[in-house]
């Protein structure tokens, strides 16, 4: 017998670690992998969007580079455990002129942990829980980003347009 809630926590850490291990810069690996492995940082995967399901080629959440930050705007859905997560692996479209999977990039987006009363205390983030049947150990959320800032250095691998490829390597 297993407990899906425990498994879902491990899956989030595995996805983030695999992304960073396979596609991260040496600096990103040094910063994040030890913290994920020790449990000091709890990551979550932020990929799925409303009305697109798992069709990542239709992804619309945008990240625009402004100086030393990416400003993220858009909506995500069915995100598991985002409230208490410290780090989001956030798939965004950085080049709207590229069709389909091209132009997608992965950001390593730190955020403060939320609470039941204030799930998303970070500026530029809001959202709400999706009520589900059955999964008592997992909480699913919708998230809205409005100019949510991520440091430019947190572009996974330091190269735009590699997000889908990086994700498929996990």
List where the protein language model places each region.
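Short Gly/Pro-enriched turn/cap motifs at secondary-structure boundaries
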Residues: 51-54, 78-81, 96-98, 131-139
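Short acidic, glycine/serine/threonine-rich loops at helix termini
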Residues: 20-21, 55-59, 82-85, 100-102, ...
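A short, Trp-centered hydrophobic/proline-enriched beta-strand micro-motif
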Residues: 39-47, 91
């Amino acid at each position: 017998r297993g407990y899906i809630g425990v498994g879902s926590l491990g899956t989030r850490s595995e996805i983030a670690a695999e992304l960073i291990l396979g596609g991260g810069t040496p600096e990103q690996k040094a910063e994040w992998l030890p913290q994920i492995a020790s449990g000091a940082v709890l990551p979550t995967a932020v990929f799925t969007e409303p009305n697109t399901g798992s069709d990542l080629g239709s992804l619309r959440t945008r990240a625009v580079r402004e100086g030393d930050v990416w400003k993220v705007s858009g909506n995500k859905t069915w995100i598991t455990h985002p409230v208490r997560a410290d780090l989001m692996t956030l798939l965004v479209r950085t080049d709207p002129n590229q069709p389909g999977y091209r132009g997608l990039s992965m950001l390593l987006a730190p955020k403060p942990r939320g609470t039941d009363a204030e799930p998303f205390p970070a500026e530029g983030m809001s959202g709400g829980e999706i009520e589900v049947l059955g999964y008592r150990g997992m909480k699913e959320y919708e998230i809205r980003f409005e100019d949510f800032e991520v440091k430019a250095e947190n572009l996974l691998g330091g190269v735009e347009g590699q997000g889908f490829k990086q994700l498929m390597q996990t």
